[in-house]
């Protein structure tokens, strides 16, 4: 194990608005915005648009409404990963920017980020827990707990794209897969890189 779960983590309670804004942007880029907005409803859409104008913490209820509306689109796994890639690219500048710059200049590996994943995760989510288990020098499992967003296929699969893109900042290539969900509020990802 490289990064253990936080002892007795609290349930996820808020999500950084940049995640939702980036996810929404990914849906818009793929031509799904109109259908997404129908699923979301006008009152929630207005709250989300106002909330994502500036970086702030949004309630898990609002985040769940966003991801549930996106989940109802029933996008293919490939499309979900593409949306995750868009989110990752947009977050690179704000959340991972300093690490990305360090990696490009000093030969940092994915373990550099994975060893700090709890801190990086804490910049995106308040509550819940994330842990990293080392399987081999270029192989890990990332486990998410106490996060109700993990119950939504859209969030689980799109996160694969985000993780892959983030890993490829530090490696030539990466592969990320999500295991079938076993318990509510949890997700497990297998990540490998070259």
Task: State each model region's role.
Residues 1-78:
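N-terminal leader/assembly segments
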Residues 4-5, 9-12, 17-20, 122-157, ...:
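Short terminal or interdomain "cap/linker" segment that borders an active site or interface and mediates
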Residues 8, 14-17, 22-23, 42, ...:
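Generic serine detector
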Residues 37, 167-168:
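Residue-level preference for well-ordered alpha-helical positions
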Residues 42-50, 91-92, 182-193:
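Short, mixed-charge aromatic SLiMs
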Residues 52-157, 180:
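Amphipathic interaction/junction segments at domain boundaries or subunit interfaces
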Residues 160:
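Short amphipathic alpha-helical segment that frequently serves as the phosphate-/nucleotide-binding helix
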